[in-house]
Curated annotation (Swiss-Prot):
Stated name of the protein: Glycoprotein Q1
Source organism of the structure: Human herpesvirus 6A (strain Uganda-1102)
Keywords, sorted A to Z: Glycoprotein, Host endoplasmic reticulum, Host-virus interaction, Late protein, Signal, Viral attachment to host cell, Viral attachment to host entry receptor, Viral envelope protein, Virion, Virus entry into host cell
Glycosylation sites: 290, 332, 338, 359, 422, 516, 552, 652
Region (Interaction with glycoprotein Q2): 163-185
Posttranslational modification: Glycosylated by host.
Length: 656
């Protein structure tokens, strides 16, 4: 009956109007229709000429009637109202709605994006079943839509243009960055690897995988010189997609080849020897006055993160270098002899000394000032490769917003020198809850990454292989219908202040007492990491701009201490590099008001202490709050004190 009604009401295909379907607790027939307000368009059907009529579903004059159960009064909403006023909880209150407009709080999703989704987000009374040969089942939050894979579908073409670049960029950049982060002990932080987990949006990744061609290959070549040596950087990306009964798998192989083009390729490693940044360069701003007193070696003052029993390489807190503003060698100090010790000073004024000739100190010294720039540039390399790939696939080269700078061979060189010889593999698992109106199920994304290096007569080859497998699996534990929460044990009592409902092999099913959030993704237990941390040689990747950043920060910090805090407020005085300036310069983006929120979120992935309108380096606290501490919601960007905000973001990264 409902099917017949829908067939009778369905307008010509050319108008591309959307039917939003719902069903009640029993067998009551329901339907949903889209209308234009009276006076805008005649009530007659659109003209027969299919090319002369286009329905824009982001038009303010279009509204949707949603019928629920036996209620004959529809809920009328325009698309903009649906996006702005329909929260996820309000949508979920409909319970039996099969498919409706997905809400994406990410400001990069425009009304046009959602309009394209609406062009084919149509379900019938077959429980939103999707034909494998012609449609892909894609989940957006708690919504399942059936996406036709026909290349000549206008909605699919538009959707590909907007979603696919984002998805492939996240897949490639996140997987490479995730692999490096896990491989190198999360760059000295036991928690920072989870920031890379949050970088990959599984739902967007699933969409990109669904739209990705079955086979794709791209090769980029770039010539450069190291002194008088002629070299070439070759970046090759291959994508292979395999569909199976349980889901689909996408394999990406990213290869970096460094080739010497002269001298028959002899001594090709010369092409990887970029001028390093030595400690003397970083420490050239030395204090002339001896106003520092370090009582004795490795003693901290009022700060728990750097105790001798808990060195910075094994700290249990977030990024101990977060608020370092100055590093210098003391002069004529009996407690920290010259040329033997180095002094680290934080924004709060805390200081400590460490031996200059210790490898740990040298690594820390290089990282404390160069880590930020090196990490961003490495990430930008991954983003650049991914975006070049997406641009090639979608033929978007030359269009607005696709201009990409050349790949920095120094970063590839640093990757070559830092990665081990043998193949290493990491395995990560994302669990995504299925919509609550469907049978309780999990959709799982498995991510496997491996790295290998090969040496040839005239070149060195670095290969990073990523395998994404999307599978659907079912469980007898009806956790999702009861809004219970699944977490993995990551060294913290994640069920703190909550009730443990079920526990099996380290996996905990918890119901928080103070929270009603949707299910968060879980992470598979990782292989035990060695206690020693292998550091990338960031000296190889610090660019000239990075040196300027370091100099600016160091100079500003010194002048501020010399002249007082008011010096920073002077109109012509040096200031700490503010967040938007730092991001804008590194990513070559203009920071307008509408995308400030996006940049702020991107920064938070690596700078958990950064405040929206404060200095780049913000004071941190040394204790972890309860993971269930709820942040305020008075503004679009929560601003709880560190580290609760960062931890809250980690637990909620599905929303970003």
């Amino acid at each position: 009956m409902a099917t017949a009604r829908l067939s009778a009401m369905k307008p010509p295909r050319s108008c591309a109007l959307i039917f939003l379907c719902a069903f009640s607790m029993a067998t009551a027939p329901t339907n949903a229709t889209a209308h234009r307000r009276a006076g805008t368009v005649k009530s007659t059907p659109p003209p027969e000429d299919k090319h002369s009529y286009t329905a824009k579903y982001y038009d303010k004059d279009i509204y949707f009637n949603i019928y629920e159960g036996r209620n004959s009064t529809p809920r009328r909403r325009t698309l903009s109202e649906i996006i702005s006023k329909f929260s996820t909880s309000e949508m979920l209150s409909l319970k039996r709605v099969k498919a409706f407009v997905p809400v994406d709080e990410n400001p990069t999703t425009t009304l046009e994006d959602i309009a394209d989704i609406l062009n084919y987000a149509v379900c019938d009374d077959n429980s939103c079943g999707c034909t494998i040969e012609t449609q892909a089942r894609i989940m957006f939050g708690d919504i399942i839509i059936c996406v036709p894979l026909s290349a000549d579908n206008k909605g699919v073409r538009n959707f590909k243009d907007r979603i696919m670049p984002k998805g492939l960029s996240q897949i490639l950049s996140s997987s490479l960055g995730l692999h490096l982060s896990l491989l190198y002990g999360a760059f000295g932080s036991n928690y920072n690897s989870l920031a890379y987990m949050r970088r990959l949006k599984p739902l967007t990744a699933m969409t990109a995988i669904a739209f990705c061609p079955m086979t794709t290959k791209l090769e980029l070549r770039q010539n450069y010189k190291v002194k008088e040596t002629l070299c070439e950087l070759i970046v090759s990306i291959e994508i292979l997609k395999i569909r199976n009964n349980g889901g689909q798998t996408m394999k990406t192989l990213t290869s970096f080849a460094i080739v010497r083009k002269d001298n028959d390729g002899q001594d090709w490693e010369t092409c990887t020897r970029f001028a390093p940044v030595n400690i003397e360069d970083i420490l050239r701003y030395k204090r002339v006055a001896n106003d520092t007193c370090c009582r004795h070696r490795d003693v901290q003052h009022g700060r728990r993160t750097l105790e001798s029993s808990n060195s910075w390489t094994q700290t249990q807190y977030f990024e101990p270098w977060q608020d370092i503003v100055d590093v210098y060698v003391p002069i004529n100090d009996t407690h920290c002899p010259n040329d033997s010790y180095v002094v680290f000073e934080t924004l709060q004024g805390f200081e400590w000394c460490s031996r200059l000739n210790k490898n740990e100190t040298k690594n820390y010294l290089s990282s404390v000032l160069g880590f930020r720039n090196a990490l961003f540039e490495t990430e930008e390399l991954m983003e650049t490769i991914a975006m070049r790939l997406a641009s090639q696939i979608l033929s978007m080269v030359g269009q607005q917003g696709t201009t990409i700078r050349d790949i920095d061979p120094a970063i590839v060189s640093a990757l070559w020198h830092s990665l081990p010889e043998n193949l290493t593999t990491t395995n990560i698992k994302y669990d995504i809850a299925s919509p609550t109106h469907m049978a309780p199920a999990l959709c799982t994304i498995f991510v496997q990454t491996g790295t290998s290096k090969q040496r040839f007569r005239n070149a060195g080859l670095l290969m990073v292989n990523n395998i994404f497998t999307v599978q659907g699996r079912y469980t007898t534990q009806n956790m999702f219908e009861r809004k219970e929460y699944v977490y993995k044990h990551l060294g913290q009592a994640l069920c703190q202040d909550g009730e443990i409902l079920f526990q099996n092999e380290g996996q905990k099913f918890c119901r928080p007492l103070t929270d009603n959030r949707t299910i968060v993704y879980t992470m598979q237990d990782q292989v035990q990491k060695p206690l020693s941390v292998t550091w990338m040689d960031f000296n190889l990747v610090i660019s000239d701009y990075g040196r300027d950043v370091i100099n600016n920060l160091t100079k500003s910090a010194m002048l501020a201490r010399k002249n007082g805090p008011r010096y920073l407020q002077m109109e012509n005085g040096p200031r700490y590099l503010q967040m938007e300036t730092f991001i804008s310069d590194l990513f070559r983006h203009e920071c307008y008001q509408d995308n400030y929120y996006v940049l702020d979120k991107k920064l938070q992935m690596f700078y958990p202490t950064t405040h929206s309108n404060e200095l780049l380096f913000y004071p941190s606290e040394a204790t972890l709050p309860s993971p269930w501490q709820e942040p305020p919601f008075s503004s679009p960007w929560p601003e709880p004190t560190f580290p609760s905000r960062w931890y809250w973001l980690l637990l909620n990264y599905t929303n970003y």
